[in-house]
């Protein structure tokens, strides 16, 4: 799914109105119907609803929503905010329609009026500005937003929380911003929804589809994408009846250190679960028994050193390499990693301590094989590129690092992002807070190795690995819960995640 900036969404609206064709007021009606369906499915009629309506099309959505909910039997109060003399044509039409519904109480509020209190029992709907405002909220309207935020009511924002900057960091926004519990956005997720710094404004968000013209969506060139099942399913390769283990590649995992052999175990098992024909784990010799016992399906290559990675094995037999989980940053390991980079042209997966070593030796980075994959968490990424002023700045640094070095950067988080050498960036839709547990990243590294070994392009491996990793985590959370979820639970659900992509049921939502 494409993530359109606000100016492109406006173009999509205009294109739809012109080419469907459909009137602006009818497109607004379509959006309000989707909102109404969500409210009726999630909010009981026993809860009265208070809608704050602005003077633009976001306000028009609010007036139309109030009318539809009143017709369903909800108790509706609307507060029409008179911060200007102008009202958009479609908003004016829905304002007049709402006025004709006797069951709706409409209160006009202007800059000189005392603000009425917000009853505690009401669910508040923010239909003030949505995504249409690009300047900070000040003055009279700031008082309205502040009053809503200071209440303890549930707040539902339409399209985007009012005052929220969708396409730039809100760390530079000195105005008031609605702090929503739920945000119902139209057709596409907004770019700003995907960053931790904005969670307190956006809350839980959902995309409501309002039928914007598919020709525009297909043709518009966009760099940022939001990964859904439909994006990933076509990438899966069908297995041949007469294939054998050699068909699906041989992955080399260089991992593990004294006290951290579990990282190597998790990654090796995940690599096999992700479909690699063979996985060899190159580990310090002290870990041999652990690996052979914990993952008997994997082969073991023992390092000359008992506790550290000190020398890479012959690389000629392998289709893909991953390095880093539990490795440590000993000087021996640093030297061995440098030689590894010099002695292969295979795209590699760099994780954990391999990234930390490169962070200490940045002059090595230009020699990393093109199309390699980096999988840092935010702190590891900071060691590579330095501090960022905000989440948007960090995303720009991530994209620039990928472009400059011709690599893929998977920045792990709630919406794990994949920055590609061509400038595109993919944000993940799967995963959950239960995956914030030790070893989760090692599982991802193993999955990436297993997928790469099968001959997938690194970009495909990144997309499939990240999406399937999160999906396996979602299945694990549904079985064990967030608190009890451990990394090996994610591994146990990799097969089920693959089945989701390879076996679409009739009538299933893609």
Residue ranges and their predicted role:
Residues 82-85, 161-162, 354:
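Short beta-alpha junction loops
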Residues 121-123, 128-222:
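Internal gly/pro-rich beta-alpha loop/helix module
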Residues 111-114, 162-166, 191, 306-308, ...:
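Short acidic loop-to-helix transition motifs that present clustered carboxylates
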Residues 1-80, 88, 182, 193-347, ...:
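Small-residue (G/A/S/T)-rich helix-start motifs and N-terminal tracts that mark the onset
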Residues 102-104, 150-153, 404-407:
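A structural motif corresponding to the C-terminal end of an alpha-helix
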Residues 90, 136-138, 169-170, 385-389:
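Short, solvent-exposed loop/turn segments at secondary-structure boundaries
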Residues 66-149, 289-301, 311-313, 317:
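N-terminal small/polar loop signature for handling phosphorylated ligands or for N-terminal nucleophile
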